[in-house]
Structure formats: structure tokens, C-alpha cells
């Protein structure tokens, strides 16, 4: 007989600094209410994201009824990557009136390559259009 599939008890989505997960909020309370071993998750997450330090890395944690878990790392949010490329701290409060910075189309394509697996796009050009739209909504102009 094949082994039984684990039954999913919950799905938790978090955005945590790479290599810096600790039991303090927001990680501790989110995992604690599902009965997951918090330190075990923190050690596994920190080891998996060590190479991406400095970025916020979203994670999707699947918690099973026997309190075991596994997690899937996503790519950093497009907004964070755009802010880093533009060299600014935050986007514009009124993006259609006040522009805070500009990025080149090459930078947008580079971000699109990074984000491709998480975007709903068939090729790099479509992904670049999605990223350019995000940039415009943040008050960042796209040159080129």
C-alpha cells in the first residue's frame, strides 16, 4: 500500500528578511497558533535564504495536521527590487503627480527575469510590462 498523504492543516504566507527569521513577531505568533516548532522553521529558513541577505523573501509555509511543515520560497517583491534599483527609500505618495526616481528598461528587464517564475507572464517582455506598471504605480518613471 502506498504511504498516506499528509493532510494539510493550514497555509501561512509571510515576508521575512532573508537570513533573519526569529521567534519574535510576525513569525512566532503565526507559526505558534498552528503548533509548528518555531525554532526549527527559523533555522531552516535562515539556512535557505543565507545567500539573499538584505532582501525581503516571501515564504509560503504548508502546515500539516501532524504539525510538520514544509515551505516554499518566493522571489523578493517587485516593489522592493524596484526601490533598490532606483536607489530610493520609498515610492511616491502621489505617484501620478510626483515622480521620485527613474529606472532604465534594462533594469526593469533584469527585475522581470528575477521575478519571472512568480509572475503570470509567458515571456520576459510581458513580465517587463508588469514590472513597469508596478514602477509607474510607485511614482518611478521607466526610461527607454
From Swiss-Prot:
> What Pfam families does UniProt report for this protein, alphabetically?
Ribosomal_L11 (PF00298), Ribosomal_L11_N (PF03946)
Q: Which GO terms describe its molecular function?
A: large ribosomal subunit rRNA binding; structural constituent of ribosome
Q: Name one GO cellular component term.
A: cytosolic large ribosomal subunit
What does the record list as GO biological process?
translation
Assigned keywords, A-Z:
Methylation, Ribonucleoprotein, Ribosomal protein, RNA-binding, rRNA-binding
UniProt keyword Ribonucleoprotein present: yes
Question: What does the PTM comment of the record read?
Answer: One or more lysine residues are methylated.
InterPro entries tied to this protein: Ribosomal_uL11, Ribosomal_uL11_bac-typ, Ribosomal_uL11_C, Ribosomal_uL11_C_sf, Ribosomal_uL11_CS, Ribosomal_uL11_N, Ribosomal_uL11_N_sf
Query: Out of the domains of life, which is the source?
Result: Bacteria
Q: How does it assemble?
A: Part of the ribosomal stalk of the 50S ribosomal subunit. Interacts with L10 and the large rRNA to form the base of the stalk. L10 forms an elongated spine to which L12 dimers bind in a sequential fashion forming a multimeric L10(L12)X complex.
The record's similarity note reads: Belongs to the universal ribosomal protein uL11 family.
The record's listing under PANTHER family reads:
60S RIBOSOMAL PROTEIN L12, LARGE RIBOSOMAL SUBUNIT PROTEIN UL11M
According to its UniProt entry, the function of this protein is described as: Forms part of the ribosomal stalk which helps the ribosome interact with GTP-bound translation factors.
What is this protein's record name?
Answer: Large ribosomal subunit protein uL11
| Organism of this sequence | Rhodococcus opacus (strain B4)
Amino acid at each position: 500500500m502506498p504511504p498516506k498523504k499528509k493532510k494539510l492543516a493550514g497555509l501561512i504566507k509571510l515576508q521575512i528578511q532573508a537570513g533573519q527569521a526569529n521567534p519574535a513577531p510576525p513569525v512566532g505568533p503565526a507559526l505558534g497558533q498552528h503548533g509548528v516548532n518555531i525554532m526549527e522553521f527559523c533555522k531552516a529558513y535562515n539556512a535557505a535564504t543565507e545567500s539573499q541577505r538584505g532582501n525581503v523573501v516571501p515564504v509560503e509555509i504548508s502546515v500539516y495536521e501532524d504539525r510538520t511543515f514544509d515551505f516554499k520560497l518566493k522571489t523578493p517583491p517587485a516593489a522592493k527590487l524596484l526601490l533598490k534599483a532606483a536607489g530610493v527609500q520609498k515610492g511616491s505618495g502621489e505617484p501620478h503627480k510626483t515622480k521620485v526616481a527613474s529606472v532604465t528598461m534594462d533594469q526593469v528587464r533584469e527585475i522581470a527575469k528575477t521575478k519571472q517564475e512568480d509572475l503570470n507572464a509567458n515571456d520576459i517582455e510581458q513580465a517587463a510590462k508588469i514590472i513597469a506598471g508596478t514602477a509607474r504605480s510607485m511614482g518611478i518613471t521607466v526610461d527607454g
